[in-house]
Amino acid sequence: MNKIHLLDEKTINKISAGEVVERPASIVKELIENSIDAGSKNITVEILEGGIPYIKVSDDGCGMNEIDAILAFERHATSKIKSDNDLYSIGTLGFRGEALASIAAVSHVTLQTKEEGALFGTKVVVEGGKVVEKTTCGCAKGCSIEVRDVFFNTPARRKFLKRPSTESMYIIDVVTKLCLSHPEVSFKYVKDRKLQFITSGNGNIEDVILRLFGNEVYSSLMSASFESEDLKLKILAGKNSLNYSNRNMQFFYVNGRYVKNKTLSAAVDEAFKTYIPVNRYPAVFLYMEIDPRQIDVNIHPSKLEIKFSDERRIFEAVYKTIKDSLHKYNLIPEVKIEEKKNIFEIETPTISAEQTKLYLTSSDKELEEEKKKFDNEFKGKNVFLKDNVLKENSKNSSLDNHLAVYEEYEHEKEEINKNDLAKKISDIRIVGTLFSTYIIVEKEDVFYIIDQHAAHERILYEKFTSQYEKIQTRQVTFPIVVELQPRDLELVHQEKELLNKLGYVFEEFGNNCIILREVPVILGQPEARQLFIDIVEKLKDKELINKISLKEENIIMMACKAAVKAMDNLSEKEIHKLFDDLKITENPYTCPHGRPVIIAITKTQLEKMFKRIM
C-alpha cells in the first residue's frame, strides 16, 4: 500500500488556514488590511469576548459586486496582483488572496458589500469554507464582515487559545499598529459593546499617538526626517528619559506596512547607545517610504518580516537621522517633585476623546532658541566660592594626576574657544559637592546636579573617539604573555587588524599564548593585559561582529576605567576644568552607558516642597 497520498481539499484548507489564522487577532489584522487596501476612510472594529465568538469589521471602501464577492472566498483569488512580476513591486498590504479563504475555513463568515452607485448589495454566508447562502441585500457602500465561532471545526486549535482577556490584548495590539500605520483613516474600536477609542483620521500621526498612548509619550517625542531620491524617512523618537525594558514601544512602518527588521532595530539601538542605560529601549515611531522594488515582503505568510536590498544604506540613514535629532533637543531631565496625597484623595485620571491637540513640531525659531538654551545654561552672576565649600585636595585627587596628559589636547581647544571658555569659567557658580560624587551648580532659578564620574566618562569617551585613528601606544619593557583558549586564539588572529587599531601589537608565543609587544596608553597609563582580555570577551559575544559597535564599546570601556570615580575628592580647579570640558562635548546629557550626567531642579519645585507656594 502506498505510504504517500494526496490530501483532500478540506484538509488542505485547514492546514493553509493555520498559517494565516493563528488566533482572533490574525483575523482582525487581515480584515482591516483588506479594508485599507479598499481605500476606506472609516473602519470600525467590534469584538466580543476576545474575538473568539464574534468579530465584525466594517468599512466605507470601494466594495465589491456579486461576482467578486463570491471569488473573494476562493484561495489565491486577489485584486492586488496579476502575475509573478508584480511580486517585486507590491504596494498593498495584502496580495496572496489567502485571507478570506483561510478565515472562512475555520469559522462562520457573513459578508455584506456594495459598490458605489449599485442599487443593491450582496450578502454571502460561508461556513467551514463552503458557501451556504448568496443573496442580494440592502447595505451601505463598502464592506462588512462578521466572523463567528473561530476554530469551531478545529477543536485542537481552539483549545490552545488563551483567555478572552488575553486574546483581547492581542487584538488591541494589532489595531494599535494599524492605526499608527494609517493616520489618514479614522478607526473606531468597540470591545464587548463598549467604545474604546476613535482616531480622527486627519492624517496627523502625532494626534494618533496622543489618542493611543497619552500625553507622557506624546510630549517627549522628538521629530526627525530624511529624504533622498528614492528614500523618505519620518521618525518620532522619545527622549532618552523615556525608555522601556523591551521593544514594545518601537513601531516600524515601511510603505504603510508594520514590519520587523533587524537592520532597523540595530540602527535605533546604535543611535541611542550612549543616551540610555543598557538593556533599555526608546520609544520610536518610524515611517519609511521606499521603492517597493528595493524590499522583499514575500518572506512569510504574516508579511511581518521584510528584507532590504541594501541593508547598510538603510542602517546609515536611520542611524544618522535619529542621531541628528538627539543633538538638536535639550535632554536634561527635570526632576518631578510630586506632593504626596492621602490615598482617599487620589482621583483616577481620564483622557477625553476631544483632548486638546498639542503641536509637536517647533518652528525654526523655537528650535534655535532650544539649541541656545543649554549653551547659555550657566551664564549666571559672578559669585565667589567660599573657602569652606570646596576643599583643595590634590593629593587624594585622581583627576589631578591626569591634567598634564590633557595639555596638548586642551591647548587645541583653547585656541578655538579661548575667550568663550574664560567667560564660562568666570560666570558659573559652583555651589559645592555632595557625597564626594555629585557637583552642584546654581544658575538663576535652577540648580543642576552633575555626576562627576558620568561627566568625566563622557569627556574621555568623546576625546578617545576623536583620537581613535591615532591611538598612542607604548612598547612594554617586559613582554606580557596572555594565555588564550584555542577558539580565542583563532579569534585574535582573525581580528588582528582591529586589535592593532585599538593599540595592541602582539605575536604568537606557542601553546595557545601570545605576547603583547605594544599596548595603548590611556591618560598616561599603559592599559595592558586585563583590558586586552576584556576586548577578546567582547569579540566572543558578537555573533556578527559590528566593527563600529565594537570600537565604540571598547572606547566606552577605556573611558570608564580612566574616568574619575565616585568618592574621589576633587579640587576647585579640577571641578572647574571638568565642568568646562563637559560644556563643549557633543552630548553633555548622558554618559556613554546612557546614564544621566546632569539633572535639573527648579526654584519653583523647591518652594512647592517647602509650601512657600501652593
Swiss-Prot record:
A matching Pfam family: DNA_mis_repair
Keyword field contains DNA repair: yes
Single GO molecular function: ATP-dependent DNA damage sensor activity
Entry keywords, A to Z: DNA damage, DNA repair
InterPro entries: DNA_mismatch_repair_CS, DNA_mismatch_repair_MutL, DNA_mismatch_S5_2-like, HATPase_C_sf, MutL/Mlh/PMS, MutL/Mlh/Pms-like, MutL_C, MutL_C_dimsub
UniProt GO BP: mismatch repair
Origin superkingdom: Bacteria
GO cellular component, one term: mismatch repair complex
CDD domains attached to this UniProt entry: HATPase_MutL-MLH-PMS-like, MutL_Trans
SMART domains per the UniProt record, alphabetical: DNA_mis_repair, MutL_C
UniProt entry tagged with the keyword 4Fe-4S: no
Similarity remark: Belongs to the DNA mismatch repair MutL/HexB family.
Function per UniProt: This protein is involved in the repair of mismatches in DNA. It is required for dam-dependent methyl-directed DNA mismatch repair. May act as a 'molecular matchmaker', a protein that promotes the formation of a stable complex between two or more DNA-binding proteins in an ATP-dependent manner without itself being part of a final effector complex.
Protein name: DNA mismatch repair protein MutL
Organism of this sequence: Thermoanaerobacter sp. (strain X514)
Lineage, highest ranks first: Bacteria, Bacillati, Bacillota, Clostridia, Thermoanaerobacterales
Gene: mutL
